[in-house]
């Protein structure tokens, strides 16, 4: 990295295109605020449904004189074969609609370009999700740079790169090899996974999915650079190696969640929480330091009623306080809660029916463990809070993130899931985790033995590094300065 320089306030205008999924939208809004705090004008373009999700956060930012605006584009859902009104990945009936929402995203290209041409001041730079490949073409026509936002960290991104370039994901292998464990070659650590865990699916990618992915990869190659929500001290060897293999500008500017400093911002990131900040903190304040297990399986993962009941029975058996965020409740599960479970755990279990204020909860000193689906936002938020994890991956990047948590960082314990469960397949998959598995993993993570102490020490040290990285003079702070300088030089350069 170049010598530390204080970047002067910028007057650049960044336009951000987040993917229509909670886990991609939330960090993009954080990035918008980080850039606006440096003086930039930022426009976020998304669908009405997602604009409504983040409007309170943006309104608070505007009230502090940050130059951020939300503009809406209507997703042509029915034209793309989606159910009417479906604007988000978490609204999809099943993963099989992935192709349709990709089509709907492609249909945004022309109206988005028309909107960009009308903006005043005109845009200087586009930052868009990896899965918006057409923004590279739009940026080229507007003669401005496009930066790619990659949701996961560099460990995952490098693993995928290695898997593709070494032909581990090639089509010439017998189908049975999908479940055989393979070692990813050339990595700083020995990482052994199955092919299906690499792609994070219950089946190999089909032609359409691979086509979409490769189109996004080609668009990334033609982009100006890559923005990653990580910090260099978390995964230094993977950051350096990924920069090398991509041979492209890259800025690690995370953990972006640390831009949330006030109670309302911590409590309302994305969807409105189903519990108030006051009630949540009051409950936590009454517990012992490091005693509470937080359980949340993300914004997209779904589990069957039978699996949820098994998880609940496991939580009941651990005899520790817990907060359980429960989403997508079926009638069967609602009945089970009312038939005695909530009453039995009332003194030590807080059930949040809906969205939980995750960063607020994780940053509370009474939280001693996090049972997580291993989405990257949850992973880095837990690290930032200094909380060790129990890993329960479902799909996408989550199995590789689990390997990073358990094998590379050594700050987590596996619950023991080996196969993916795509949303929409939860009833077919059934119960993968028994109540005994829950109890065993919690005891392993939170007991006061030497392994547990070492995990806690490691994650607390990483949390300190995260905060230093985001503070003035830290690596991520300097990388934001570098990003602004690089874009400024490109925009000002004669064409």
Curated annotation (Swiss-Prot):
Q: Which EC number(s) are documented for this chain? A: 2.4.1.-
Q: Which PROSITE patterns match?
A: UDPGT
Q: Which Pfam families match?
A: UDPGT (PF00201)
Residues engaged in binding UDP-alpha-D-glucose: 299, 355-356, 373-381, 395-398
At the top level, the lineage of the source is: Eukaryota
Enzyme class label: transferase
Q: Any idea which UniProt keywords this protein has?
A: Glycosyltransferase, Transferase
Give this protein's Gene Ontology molecular function annotations: UDP-glucosyltransferase activity
- Tell me if NADP is a UniProt keyword of this record: no
Matching entries from PANTHER family are given as: GLYCOSYLTRANSFERASE
Family membership: Belongs to the UDP-glycosyltransferase family.
Q: What does this protein do?
A: May glycosylate diterpenes or flavonols in leaves.
Protein name listed in UniProt: UDP-glycosyltransferase 73E1
Q: Which organism is it from?
A: Stevia rebaudiana (Stevia)
